[in-house]
Amino acid sequence: AGVKYRLAVPREGYRAWFGGLSLSRHAQGPVLDAAYAYLNWWLSGWPGAVMARQGYYIGNPARSRDHLSSAEWDYWYAGQPAREELLGSDGLPLIDIGEVRDGGSYEQRMGHIAVWNSVMDEHNYLVRRWGDFMRARST
């Protein structure tokens, strides 16, 4: 039993945010090697697939495609109806057959961003309200 909801698809455009990784100019030797290994892991595809199963995107989606089933790719990136039940990153059912992602395909969603933020002023408030919503959804 869950709460029925629908995400807003504002006519004016989405507000999006981006988090990135970078290296300190002071990193050297084994620390620098470990930092590059970590960055490369993020770009390897598997982390992006895990993120996709939570509804998020990664900067190099093509690398994630090999780690998603064709049904997952079609739902999360192509904007098509789910042709099978899809699991979330926790392995539990998340998307029902026939469900369509609000906002369309990756290209449609990315093409409709009006404002980019790094961290919104409302972030802490929204995280608390999202937690409230998720707790209500599970009862």
Which positions does each model-derived feature cover?
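Sec/Tat-exported extracytoplasmic proteins
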Residues: 1, 42-46, 55, 130, ...
